[in-house]
Amino acid sequence: MLISKRIVMSITNEQILDAVADMSVMQVVELIEAMEEKFGVTAAAAVVAGGAAAEAAEEQTEFDVILTAVGAQKVQVIKAVRGATGLGLKEAKAVVDSAPASVKEGVDKAEAEALKAQLEEVGASVEIK
């Protein structure tokens, strides 16, 4: 009576990759089909769900300068708002009186930082969004 023994060899990932690298394209396709059938899976490409996250990660290029509080030097803040925006006295006073209010919208970072520094210099509290 003959007893067959099954000898299991330890095959490394490196050896598997080398074997696949030596195959022709048709052999690789057949291997993939056999693996799909044996394991009940498909070799469809994974869908990357990072499109929205990538957009959010982009650096912001436009900023809004928000006057959050006027401080003690209201007249100086009005003058600074007028100078930065080109508004008339009445319009600039209305912006300052309605704090928190947007002083300038859609400006680049450098301009937003400069305006913030100018308004803070005269005692206003400013936020950049």
Curated annotation (Swiss-Prot):
Cross-referenced InterPro entries: Ribosomal_bL12 (IPR000206), Ribosomal_bL12_C (IPR013823), Ribosomal_bL12_C/ClpS-like (IPR014719), Ribosomal_bL12_oligo (IPR008932), Ribosomal_bL12_oligo_N_sf (IPR036235)
Keyword Ribonucleoprotein: yes
Purpose: Forms part of the ribosomal stalk which helps the ribosome interact with GTP-bound translation factors. Is thus essential for accurate translation.
Lineage: Bacteria, Pseudomonadati, Pseudomonadota, Gammaproteobacteria, Vibrionales
Subunit structure: Homodimer. Part of the ribosomal stalk of the 50S ribosomal subunit. Forms a multimeric L10(L12)X complex, where L10 forms an elongated spine to which 2 to 4 L12 dimers bind in a sequential fashion. Binds GTP-bound translation factors.
Keywords, ordered alphabetically: Ribonucleoprotein, Ribosomal protein
GO CC terms of this entry: cytosolic large ribosomal subunit
Species for this entry: Photobacterium profundum (strain SS9)
Family affiliation: Belongs to the bacterial ribosomal protein bL12 family.
Disulphide-bonded residues: none
Keyword presence, DNA-binding: no
Molecular function GO labels: mRNA binding; structural constituent of ribosome
GO biological process: translation
The name this protein goes by in its record: Large ribosomal subunit protein bL12
Pfam families: Ribosomal_L12 (PF00542), Ribosomal_L12_N (PF16320)
